């Protein structure tokens, strides 16, 4: 791939033609929605999403749930106003379960997020500012040179462990597990019993993980899964899954 890129760069006409094609191809390669739709072929797939936000902005699962009318999903979001948006965006279909909770070790803990009034006072905030929910206040404070600090709010939340949540909600199998929790991803993923639940795809955010936790997550999964970097995420594809050894994904493989 690198050799091809170098050859194209040396020929201006080829470069002008190839650049948009390459960008389109790379964009598809980095899009988890594309790969989930390619690999998960079950008509009645079960999705578990931890950190659902509003179920729309920047959500790789939303379009799949709308396209596949028999897919079911457990959607978990701790921030109250985002949870209400989440319910509104998906409606009252029986195939969706909504849980307003945070996944941790089961203890009561203070959870922090950005008040929605921040956008009124700082209009140029990016659309994803309200995705900054965390058990770590400093994680939010560190964003945008600290301008969000006056708008950080908190609430004591009764946490729940992932196994307890799955048992309580009657989840017996998982086809797709998506975790997006601002640096808490490994702590949640590590609670998954891979002997009981063996998802076809696990998608989680690595960008905010300490290097030790990122490496631990890879070690945890690599026996059963092929691991790929998709931008800020790692996508784990079960080795037994359809098209698990996709050649077009090879260059994105995790090497740790």
What are these regions (language model features)?
Residues 1-256:
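Phosphate/nucleotide-binding beta-alpha loop and adjacent structural elements of enzyme active sites
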């Amino acid at each position: 791939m690198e050799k091809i890129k170098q050859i194209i760069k040396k020929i201006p006409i080829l470069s002008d033609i190839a650049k948009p094609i390459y960008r389109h191809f790379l964009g598809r390669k980095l899009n988890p929605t594309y790969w989930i739709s390619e690999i998960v072929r079950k008509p009645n797939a079960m999705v578990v999403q931890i950190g659902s936000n509003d179920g729309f902005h920047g959500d790789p699962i939303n379009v799949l749930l709308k396209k596949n009318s028999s897919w079911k999903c457990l959607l978990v979001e701790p921030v109250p106003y985002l949870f209400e948006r989440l319910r509104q965006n998906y409606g009252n279909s029986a195939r969706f379960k909504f849980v307003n909770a945070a996944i941790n070790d089961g203890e009561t803990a203070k959870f922090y997020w950005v008040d929605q009034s921040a956008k009124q006072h700082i209009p140029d905030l990016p659309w994803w500012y309200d995705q900054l929910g965390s058990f770590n206040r400093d994680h939010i404070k560190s964003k945008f040179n600290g301008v969000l600090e006056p708008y950080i709010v908190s609430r004591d939340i009764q946490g729940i462990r992932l196994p307890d949540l799955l048992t309580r909600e009657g989840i017996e199998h998982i086809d797709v597990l998506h975790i997006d929790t601002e640096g808490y991803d490994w702590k949640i993923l590590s609670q998954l019993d891979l002997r009981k639940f063996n998802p076809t795809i696990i998608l989680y955010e690595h960008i905010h993980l300490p290097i030790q936790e990122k490496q631990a997550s890879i070690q945890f999964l690599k026996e059963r899964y092929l691991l790929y970097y998709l931008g800020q995420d790692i996508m784990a594809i079960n080795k037994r899954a359809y098209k698990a050894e996709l050649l077009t994904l090879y260059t994105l493989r995790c090497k740790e």
